[in-house]
Amino acid sequence: MAFKREIQGVVVKIAGEKTVSVLVERKVVHPKYRKIVKRFKKYLIHDERNEVKVGDTVVAVECRPLSKRKSFRLKSVLATGVE
């Protein structure tokens, strides 16, 4: 079985029906200055049951492309956000 990539991030927007936008943070070492810097990227996640809210911390797993920009499915909700 193939390795499925997992990402963890915070829901920043309800992007539509069964779709949420998740902000993922990663830390990398700057090649010249050797300082740890934060890099951010937004992913569209498929949420079949519309169970997440803005501010929730979620885990998503890679799947087949569901649309032009959506290729991750919701796996679990780690923490609920404060609204």
Curated annotation (Swiss-Prot):
The lineage of its organism: Bacteria, Pseudomonadati, Campylobacterota, Epsilonproteobacteria, Campylobacterales. Keywords: Ribonucleoprotein, Ribosomal protein, RNA-binding, rRNA-binding. SUPFAM superfamilies: Nucleic acid-binding proteins. InterPro entries: NA-bd_OB-fold, Ribosomal_uS17, Ribosomal_uS17_bact/chlr, Ribosomal_uS17_CS. One of its GO terms (cellular component) is cytosolic small ribosomal subunit. Part of the 30S ribosomal subunit. The keyword Membrane does not apply. HAMAP family: Ribosomal_uS17_B (MF_01345_B). This is Small ribosomal subunit protein uS17. GO terms for molecular function: rRNA binding; structural constituent of ribosome. Belongs to the universal ribosomal protein uS17 family. The keyword RNA-binding applies. One of its GO terms (biological process) is translation. One of the primary rRNA binding proteins, it binds specifically to the 5'-end of 16S ribosomal RNA. Pfam families: Ribosomal_S17.
